[in-house]
Amino acid sequence: MAKEKFDRSKEHANIGTIGHVDHGKTTLTAAIATVLAKNGDTVAQSYDMIDNAPEEKERGITINTSHIEYQTDKRHYAHVDCPGHADYVKNMITGAAQMDGGILVVSAADGPMPQTREHILLSRNVGVPALVVFLNKADMVDDEELLELVEMEVRDLLSEYDFPGDDVPVIVGSALKALEGDAEYEQKILDLMQAVDDYIPTPERDSDKPFMMPVEDVFSITGRGTVATGRVERGQIKVGEEVEIIGITEESMKTTVTGVEMFRKLLDYAEAGDNIGALLRGVAREDVQRGQVLAAPGSITPHTKFKADVYVLSKDEGGRHTPFFTNYRPQFYFRTTDVTGVVNLPEGTEMVMPGDNVEMTVELIAPIAIEDGTRFSIREGGRTVGSGVVTEIQQ
């Protein structure tokens, strides 16, 4: 079947649902697609279709990020349903890194929970520009005052992490009722999407910068070659252009992009913000891996040593309970992958306590494509214990 071309007439934004486990992120995602489908351009998605990663059926928790698309009158949205469970923060980091804005889902019956805070912090650290709040399960709360109290709590929490808590739109509703077709609650979903349209800024596309795409996944298509998938972080890539594969390995490798597709539709080019698959000429499946980037030749280089400003999570935020010292060896999570590195603290700083801000030097065991301003998380045993930004490349 010939693939149809992708329509670019509307502005495009990547958004996602974040929040504590079981507060209703996936139900809300299904409700948005279902309610918008009644208005035309969107294909309805059932809860099961979105909650479709294999592991989670056993545990009833969302593990992988699901991508769905829908449209409002103003925009075309690609929506990621971010995992909400602490064990799966790794995916949350990959997911949140793909957001021009987020919908923070908080159960009105429960109020903000530990992962609510963690996801707000992660959103701040991975540079999500704006959040809109959906107070879910409002049908289970009879007390108006309780709703107001929860809303105040959420606003305070957002302000604590440098989001404008007083200005953030808060929509009160019930995703489940909307999904069941209750007209009053369907309207709340439309109100939410209106808020997303109005409040989440049109993404400043980095289309004019040199091309770069972090590789999320790689697979082979028999007879066609190797495809790398990911979200274009900046620039444009046209079919026939040359790219470098950078990071993890000592040697970078050049190749030509022979095809680009998005949502199973073929494109002549892709630009910043697009989730794409890039077909690479003459590249074996094992030559590309998650954690590398595809980039315009010469535009970004692999490095192992850099200075960074780091915030170390406090114990209450789910961070370490004890201080760390020079020669601490955690994992540094860049874009899509963890790389072990050794920490060197500045002279006069003997140790770093949970909750501290610190400038440190890091030396990675494998080279990664980085530059000033590149963000990362610090993790140990799958748990986020800090986050930082590269301030100076050293080698």
Curated annotation (Swiss-Prot):
GO molecular-function terms, A-Z = GTP binding; GTPase activity; translation elongation factor activity
- In this chain, the stretch annotated as G3 covers 81-84
Q: Which UniProt keywords apply?
A: Cytoplasm, Elongation factor, GTP-binding, Hydrolase, Magnesium, Metal-binding, Nucleotide-binding, Protein biosynthesis
EC number(s) reported in the record: 3.6.5.3
Q: Which GO terms describe its cellular component?
A: cytosol
Instruction: Tell me the ranges covered by the tr-type G domain, including all copies.
Output: 10-204
In residue numbers, the region (G1) covers 19-26
The superkingdom of the source organism is Bacteria
Q: Give the catalysed reaction(s), semicolon-separated.
A: GTP + H2O = GDP + phosphate + H(+)
Which residues does the annotation say bind Mg(2+)? T26
* UniProt-annotated location(s): Cytoplasm
Q: Which protein family is named in the record?
A: Belongs to the TRAFAC class translation factor GTPase superfamily. Classic translation factor GTPase family. EF-Tu/EF-1A subfamily.
Q: What is this protein called?
A: Elongation factor Tu
In its UniProt entry, the species of origin is given as Staphylococcus carnosus (strain TM300)
